[in-house]
Structures are given as C-alpha cells and as structure tokens.
Regions:
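Short beta-strand->loop
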Residues: 29-32, 114-115, 130-132, 138, ...
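Ligand-binding pocket segment of bilobal, Venus flytrap-like solute-binding proteins
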Residues: 171, 176-245
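Short, low-complexity disordered leader/linker segments with a strong preference
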Residues: 1-26
Length: 341
C-alpha cells in the first residue's frame, strides 16, 4: 500500500508539474539601477518568503553572460530598460515564453510582446524639455523640427552610445527611412549646444545654467528632479517645461520605450519567477513604481504620479517595440555617419 501511494503521488506530481528542484529564491540579471526596484523586491520577499537575488550590469554584458552560461545559468529573469535589448535576447534564443493569465490581464495589450517572450513593467516617453525663459511651447512641434537651423547652438542631448538615444533613432528609422533620418541626425549635430555628455539630468541642469535651450530626455527624469532632496536639482527641474513631440492630428505620437522582464530559457525557479512578475504588474506594485520612479505604469488601471499627471496626456507612437531592436544596428550606423558622438 505504501509503494502504491508513492506511485500515485509521483504521477500527480508529473501531471501537475511539481518542481521539487525549485529553491525558495529568484535570481535576476538586471540592467536597472533604480532604488524603487530594491523596494519592490523587499516587498515581495516579505509577502512570499521568496528571496530575490540581483546581479547588475549593462544589458549587453548580461545577455552575453546568459549565452555563455547556457543551461548552467542560475538566472531566472532578465530585466532591462529597453525593448530592443529584450528583442535581441529573444533572437539569441535566451528566453522562454511567459505564460500567465494574470500578467496578461494586468498589462496593457499594446505594450506586451506579441511573441510572448517579454513583459513590460513600466514605460516612459522620450520628450523635449525647454527653457521657461528662452523658448515658447508654440515654437516646438516634432522631433523632426529639431533639425531646423533655427535651433542652431541650442540643443542638448547625451551621447549616441546611450540606449535611450539609440532607441529613439531606431524608431525614427522605422517610421521615416534611412535618407530622412540621416538628414535629421546631421541637422541635430549641427544644432548641438555642446558636444554630447552626461546623463539626462545633466542636460536639464545645462539648460538651467544657460548652456542650451532644449533637451531630449526621458520623461521620468523630470519627476526625479522635481522630487529631489537637492535644491539645485529641484531648481533645474523648475527651470524647464515638458513638451511631447509629434502630437498633431496627423502625427504618429511621441516615442516610448519600456522597462521589461524576460524569463531565461533555463530558469531554475520558473514558478517563483511567475509569482514575482504577477506581483510587479499588480496595482499595488505599479503604484509603487509610478510614485517613486515617475515612470508610466504598464497596468492601465494605475494612474501616473501627480507630477506626471500635471504634464497632461499624450499620443503614443504605436510602433511595434520589437522594431527598436530590429533597426538598432542601422541607427548606430546613422550616428556614426553623421558625427553624433
């Protein structure tokens, strides 16, 4: 009878996909460097008792590490700030599909990977900010207009090696084609207020210091500046206003990108990982994101923070986000050809 019961339990375990090899932890390879992530993982640990371990590096390094580790990789999840990197990892065969009705119900359908290999947790817009003293909103219109010579010596932006700019250029390439984006990029270079340097915060600080009049930045950085404990950063944030480009009736909308997770092909803690992703896309966790990182929620039930709401709603470029990876190499070639350092 004892052996019979053991046999029955073994069959049930197979039928219901019991995984006796899963440990009480999750291992994440993360490109994200935000304090809110630590808070989210701590909240999850308290709720479930599942330990979250994080290794941080840039996205390409982490993807290469996953490739080299193969079936022996300890990683369960890969998280990055760029849909293009998620698409790259999927093309490399490093991920498996994420199957969860709860996640699919939580996340806006327009943001989720149509192939099922990655999910968004937040998104942001690549916006324009302009000097309150030297620029009027009526002077601004589109990304394309920034190449006009009227902006010569007035535009601030970070290096072409930055993933945010590469994603923007990829979206422009997909929407406009090679010839147009090469002309656009040349125009932007001619209009630089200075050689590209620093991060997005530094571009806003440069406007405040009178070194330029317009900057291309991620939307959440303005929220971070305005909520900073450093008065200099608050002052910089207050010196500019937010403008969402390409909002006209016949325009495509502003470029967005996501932060998102993929589950590794050989994830040793698959069920724990699904639990974490279900939590991170829940209303509770999404509210934590928007009120701490000033990103937009991937869950449409969650409103932006009060600061972000004050900028108003905007039309989103509905380009398939996987194309941010598809056109990445072409975007980099455009930067190189046009001298965008």
């Amino acid at each position: 009878m004892k052996n019979y019961l053991i046999s029955i339990l073994s069959v049930l375990c197979i039928v219901y996909s019991c995984d006796t090899n899963e440990s009480n932890e999750i291992n994440i390879y993360s490109q994200r460097h935000y304090e809110v992530d630590k808070k989210q993982y701590e909240n999850f640990e308290q709720k479930t008792g599942i330990k979250v371990n994080v290794i941080k590096a840039n996205a390409d390094e982490l993807l290469e590490r996953l490739k080299n580790e193969g079936a022996n990789s300890p990683a369960d999840l890969f998280v990055t700030v760029d849909a293009g990197k998620l698409q790259k990892g999927a093309e490399m065969g490093l991920f498996q599909k994420i199957n969860s009705d709860e996640i699919n119900n939580n996340v806006s359908k327009e943001l989720i990977d149509k192939n099922g290999y990655w999910i968004p947790i937040t998104y942001r817009a690549r916006i324009l900010v302009y000097s309150n003293d030297r620029v009027m909103a009526s002077e601004l219109s589109t990304y394309e207009d920034l190449a006009d010579e009227k902006w010569k010596g007035r535009i601030l932006v970070r290096s072409s090696s930055n993933a945010y700019n590469q994603a923007l250029m990829s979206s422009l390439y997909a929407n406009l084609g090679q010839e147009t984006v090469e002309k656009w990029s040349s125009g932007i270079v001619n209009n630089f207020a200075r050689d590209p340097k620093g991060n997005d915060r530094d571009q806003v600080k440069a406007i405040a210091a009178g070194q330029g009049d317009i900057a291309i930045v991620n939307s959440y950085y303005i929220g971070l500046l305005l909520s900073s404990e450093k008065q200099q950063e608050v002052d910089a944030g207050n010196s500019v206003s937010v403008f969402f480009p390409n909002q006209g009736e016949n325009e495509r909308g502003s470029h967005i990108n996501i932060s998102g997770f993929a589950m590794t092909k050989n994830a040793p803690n698959k069920q724990n990982s699904i639990k974490l992703l279900e939590y991170l896309t829940s209303v509770e966790a999404q509210e934590t994101y928007v009120n701490n990182s000033y990103e937009y929620a991937a869950n449409s039930l969650v409103m932006p923070s009060e600061i972000v709401q004050s900028w108003g709603e905007f039309k989103i470029d509905e380009l398939d986000l996987n194309k941010l990876g598809t056109y990445r190499n072409e975007a980099i070639k455009v930067f190189d050809k046009t001298g965008w350092k």
